[in-house]
Amino acid sequence: MAIQSDSLSSLPDSPRIVAPQPVSPNEESIERALRPKALEEYVGQQRAREQLEIFIAAARKRGEALDHVLLFGPPGLGKTTLAHIIAHEMGVQLRQTSGPVLERPGDLAALLTNLERNDVLFIDEIHRLSPVVEEILYPALEDFQIDILIGEGPAARSVKLDLQPFTLVGATTRAGMLTNPLRDRFGIVSRLEFYNTDELARIVTRSASLLNADITADGAHEVARRSRGTPRIANRLLRRVRDYAQVKAHGVIDQDAAGRALAMLDVDPQGLDVMDRKLLEAIVHKFDGGPVGVDSLAAAIGEERDTIEDVIEPYLIQHGYLQRTPRGRTATLTTWRHLGLTPPAAASGGTGELFSK
C-alpha cells in the first residue's frame, strides 16, 4: 500500500526545509512508515551497522540482553531508526521516551519495572536527564536493580527492586554533555556520520517506491546531493519534489524536475538554504570573513547560539564552509567562492592559510 504524502498546509509557518529535526507531527508519522525494520534494509553507517550485526548475533546466541548502546551524532541521521532495528533484531519490545520527559525518579522507575526480559529502553536526548533521575539509572544499568523510597518522613524506607535484564539505547546530539559516569556505562558506543550522495540516493529511491512515486536514477541523485548528508532531509525534499512533479512534470521525478523543484524551494545545489547563506554572508560582509565569536554571530543573524551550534554549523563545518578557531568562526575559501566573491589577498589574524594555495 502506498504511503500518502503530507500536504504543504500541514507544515508550520516558515519551517526550514533543510532542518534536520521533524517539522510536523505528520512528518514524524511518515518517517515511521518509511523507516527500515531490519539491519539488512538499513543504508549507510557501515561501521556502526557491522558492529551491531556482530554484537546482536552474539547476544542472541547467548540468550542475553544486548549491552547498553549509546548513539550520538547530528540530528536526522537515524539514531531512532537504529534503536527500533536493535529491538527488532533482538526479537524484543522497544519502550521509547526522552530525557526531558523523565522529570522524577518515579517516572524512570515505572518504565524500568515494566520492561520484560531483554527489552530495549530507548531514551532520546539522554544528555538532558536530570541528575536525580540519572542517579537512579546507574544501578539499573550495572546490576539491574533500583532503590525506591517508600513512605515519607521518619517512616520512609528504601526498598531494592530487581529488574529484568534490559538494553538501554541512549541517543544524543551532544555527547560532550553526558556525565562521565553515565557515558562509562555504555558498552557499545557508535557515532553516526553524515551520509554520502550515493547512500542518500539509495534511501531516496527506496522511499520513492514506498511513496508510490516515479523517480529516475538521476532524479534520486539530484535530491540526494542537496540533502545535506541527512536521510530525514532527503525524505522531506523527496515529498516536496513529488508534489512539484505531479503538478509540473507529469508525475515523473527526473533530474530536471528535481532541480526546478528544489530551486523553487530555495535549496541550492550544495544543499544550502537561506539561513545558511545568511550566516555565511554575515561572516563575510559584517565581519570581513572572521574570526567572529558565536555570540556576536548569533546577534548578527537573529538566531539562538544553540541553533547555530547544533543545527546550522555542523553541515557547514563538515563541508568546509566554516572553520572554528580559538578566536571564533572564520569563512573559508569555499564560502567566498560559493557566494561569488573574491577573497582578500591576505587574511589577517592567522587565517591566511585558508586562502593560500
From Swiss-Prot:
Residues 269-357 are annotated as: Head domain (RuvB-H). Its main location: cytoplasm. Residues 13-195 are annotated as: Large ATPase domain (RuvB-L). Its EC number is 3.6.4.-. SMART domains: AAA (SM00382). Residues 1-15 have a biased composition (Low complexity). SUPFAM superfamilies: P-loop containing nucleoside triphosphate hydrolases, Winged helix' DNA-binding domain. It catalyses: ATP + H2O = ADP + phosphate + H(+). InterPro entries: AAA+_ATPase, AAA_lid_4, DNA_helicase_Holl-junc_RuvB, P-loop_NTPase, RuvB-like_N, RuvB_C, WH-like_DNA-bd_sf, WH_DNA-bd_sf. Keywords: ATP-binding, Cytoplasm, DNA damage, DNA recombination, DNA repair, DNA-binding, Hydrolase, Nucleotide-binding. The keyword Electron transport does not apply. It is found in: Cytoplasm. Mg(2+) binds at T80. DNA binds at R305, R324, R329. One of its GO terms (cellular component) is cytoplasm. Pfam families: AAA_lid_4, RuvB_C, RuvB_N. Belongs to the RuvB family. Has 3 domains, the large (RuvB-L) and small ATPase (RuvB-S) domains and the C-terminal head (RuvB-H) domain. The head domain binds DNA, while the ATPase domains jointly bind ATP, ADP or are empty depending on the state of the subunit in the translocation cycle. During a single DNA translocation step the structure of each domain remains the same, but their relative positions change. Homohexamer. Forms an RuvA(8)-RuvB(12)-Holliday junction (HJ) complex. HJ DNA is sandwiched between 2 RuvA tetramers; dsDNA enters through RuvA and exits via RuvB. An RuvB hexamer assembles on each DNA strand where it exits the tetramer. Each RuvB hexamer is contacted by two RuvA subunits (via domain III) on 2 adjacent RuvB subunits; this complex drives branch migration. In the full resolvosome a probable DNA-RuvA(4)-RuvB(12)-RuvC(2) complex forms which resolves the HJ. The RuvA-RuvB-RuvC complex processes Holliday junction (HJ) DNA during genetic recombination and DNA repair, while the RuvA-RuvB complex plays an important role in the rescue of blocked DNA replication forks via replication fork reversal (RFR). RuvA specifically binds to HJ cruciform DNA, conferring on it an open structure. The RuvB hexamer acts as an ATP-dependent pump, pulling dsDNA into and through the RuvAB complex. RuvB forms 2 homohexamers on either side of HJ DNA bound by 1 or 2 RuvA tetramers; 4 subunits per hexamer contact DNA at a time. This is Holliday junction branch migration complex subunit RuvB. It comes from Bordetella bronchiseptica (strain ATCC BAA-588 / NCTC 13252 / RB50) (Alcaligenes bronchisepticus). The gene is ruvB.
